[in-house]
Amino acid sequence: MGIKGLTALLSENAPGAMREQKFTSYLDRRVAIDASMHIYQFMIAVGRTGEQTLTNEAGEVTSHLQGMLMRTSRMLEAGIKPVYVFDGKPPTMKGGELAKRKDKREEAEAALKAAREAGNQEEVEKLSKRTVRVSKEQSMEVMKLAQLLGIPAFEAPCEAEATCAAMCKAGLVWAVGTEDMDTLTFAAPRVARNLMAPKSAEKPVLEFDYEKTIAGLGLTADQFIDLCILCGCDYTDTIRGVGPKTALKLIKEHGSIEKILEAIDTEKYPPPKDWEFAGARELFKNPEVMDVSGINLSWKAPDEEGLVEFLVKEKQFQEDRVRGVCARIRKARQGAASQNRLESFFGPPKIISSTIGKRKVEETKSGKGSKAGLNKKSKGVSGYKSKKT
């Protein structure tokens, strides 16, 4: 799920923390990828027609492998160096959120059955996406694929995004590639969204800077964590009736959740019973992560014959397509070997602002300006949403 409404909140209150980057701007950059989150997205989107997912002749789902193969190939061809990190066991505090997700899946499955019986194809397609779940076997298949492609791959002891953030803080990678904004709550120095989007989507990479985030909001690191808990996170519930804007206002006024609870009308804004916000805060401050101190990251040439054995012979992929991917990656590696990184390659970042929740009016000078100019909106980022189910 990430942090509810955080992107919109930053767009309005700390636009300098966000910038649009070209995909090619990440040439020679190391990026830790939240693999588990992206596998789920591939299971929903890649090769889906109605409620039918991409499968091989044996009926095995291959959407996760197809999606990861093509997105990984695109990154490697662009000179990006991905590091894949997979979820380990969920933290105990996430049990409530996981139970809610299970209930929602069961509700969706019941509604899906009714939609099938009614012949409502639009509802069938929508509801079938809500019933998707990623198995341990599918995660291990993607890890095997990454290793055959010559990419470092790790299973985190707990949440993948927390270990990704630890890698970024340690300087092992430049940024974390994920759609989940709670990676920023784990204090990852840079978070890159849309890095795994298909080329056809033509989405710029949306990069968030942690230090500029807390500076732009006027908060300390601890206050930012409390803000994220108030907005809504995976680890605990939040105060009913308090959305992101109100949460920011309250944190700025009172400084902490404890002080907020002392000050607000709890009948108007009832907090959850036995609210474990302190436990959630501790999870964000000191998450269980992999020891990254002794990690030596290296990228190798793809194991072409190993990929053919796995994808073609086991999973019925087309051999010419698999070999074509390997050829493109080899060509990119050869080109990268003869290049040095040029800082001039990066154009000036485009700082973006948003009109989410408010209308920006351009003030006129010396009486100049028209009504048309006064009513013109600046480009927002409301299309960017975190999604974790």
From Swiss-Prot:
Residues that hold DNA according to the record: 71, 159, 232, 234
Cited function: Structure-specific nuclease with 5'-flap endonuclease and 5'-3' exonuclease activities involved in DNA replication and repair. During DNA replication, cleaves the 5'-overhanging flap structure that is generated by displacement synthesis when DNA polymerase encounters the 5'-end of a downstream Okazaki fragment. It enters the flap from the 5'-end and then tracks to cleave the flap base, leaving a nick for ligation. Also involved in the long patch base excision repair (LP-BER) pathway, by cleaving within the apurinic/apyrimidinic (AP) site-terminated flap.
CDD domains linked: PIN_FEN1
Annotated S-S bridges: none
Residues annotated as binding Mg(2+) 2: 180, 182, 234
Feature: compositional bias, Basic residues: 374-389
Subunit structure: Interacts with PCNA. Three molecules of FEN1 bind to one PCNA trimer with each molecule binding to one PCNA monomer. PCNA stimulates the nuclease activity without altering cleavage specificity.
Similarity section: Belongs to the XPG/RAD2 endonuclease family. FEN1 subfamily.
Positions annotated to bind Mg(2+) 1: 34, 87, 159, 161
Listed cofactors: Mg(2+)
Gene Ontology terms describing biological process: base-excision repair; DNA replication, removal of RNA primer
SMART domains xrefs: 53EXOc, HhH2, XPGI, XPGN
Provenance organism: Ostreococcus tauri
Region of interest: N-domain: 1-105
Record's protein name: Flap endonuclease 1
GO cellular component, one term: nucleolus
GO molecular function, one term: 5'-flap endonuclease activity
Region (Disordered): 356-389
Region (I-domain): 123-254
Pfam families: XPG_I, XPG_N
